């Protein structure tokens, strides 16, 4: 399939209205796929996301002996034997951070060698803290650059009473170890060390999914979890819509003064990015300072929205955005300054947006480099709702988590140049 080189958004000039259901949660889908793959028996996952990231996870599990059927666009039927098998070739996971981190840890439960690799972007994303934690368990694991590829020479088991992990860079390291730990031989305490972890809510998603698949896990302190060696059992599992995807629709609604029905109440989400709704709803009077540490994937959405706010906005607690699919702080400042020089400034790991509501209605031709990052593409599309001339480069990168994004906006009344 030929990729679209660029897409120019035509400001609709009217409120956006209609029903727009976000896809299933990427974070929950990839957790559930792995847990179902580790379980013995057949699990049925409904409401699931079918996207680049979840396809990478599903294909990797297939390569490790798990049978996965897809009877429709939102369902996975997963049949596992209770044990993952060594794949015949390296696992290629594109730029899927969840799949890469989760499968690196799960590879310790494989009796054989597993190589976890990704594309040129994934090969720049750090995985050292997870590798170091696994080594302390006696697991033979190597990552020469501190980034993928990672080679795990597993024995199918590990023994540990306690695992220390620095989750300062990513909560995914912690989630990976938690899911691995239920396959151990004895109870394990997993304890955070180092810098305060961001996005603790994603660990709550992990433990909730683990419990749904039969694991026993308990939070014994603010930084410690105890996991029993239960393994996993097959389960039917319903996946809620993606809160990160919902943020674009919430922002489109307030920017256009429209009315968009997401098909699910705003308070029904359990994902961390759902916290963004209360912030977005305050537009055009966003707070002067926004802490993005607990809603990291929503920061690009709110940063572009902030360009049209009544007063400037400083984003703090977002250092982790530098090691996402791209350096999102740099990508946001670059894109905003392409729209108008001086619109954004980086101060250390903070981002300051010098808001100007007068931007709305102007013609400001700007090509937005997405750096192949789905969230940069989807966020800057919002600017195109109010400014004439916004062109998104590599718009198909949204396929990572929201393949129907452009069609969804079109159904609400947005038109484009450069895409059918």
Curated annotation (Swiss-Prot):
Cellular component terms per the entry's GO annotation: cytoplasm
Swiss-Prot/TrEMBL catalytic activity: 3-phosphoshikimate + phosphoenolpyruvate = 5-O-(1-carboxyvinyl)-3-phosphoshikimate + phosphate
Binding, phosphoenolpyruvate: 26, 97, 125, 172, 328, 375, 400
Disordered: annotated segments: 1-24
Catalytic residues as annotated in Swiss-Prot or TrEMBL: 297 (proton acceptor)
Pathway where this protein functions: Metabolic intermediate biosynthesis; chorismate biosynthesis; chorismate from D-erythrose 4-phosphate and phosphoenolpyruvate: step 6/7
EC identifiers of the protein: 2.5.1.19
Alphabetically ordered keywords of this record: Amino-acid biosynthesis, Aromatic amino acid biosynthesis, Cytoplasm, Transferase
Coiled-coil intervals: none
NCBIfam families reported in the protein's UniProt record: aroA
Family that this chain belongs to: Belongs to the EPSP synthase family.
Oligomer and partners: Monomer.
Protein name, UniProt field: 3-phosphoshikimate 1-carboxyvinyltransferase
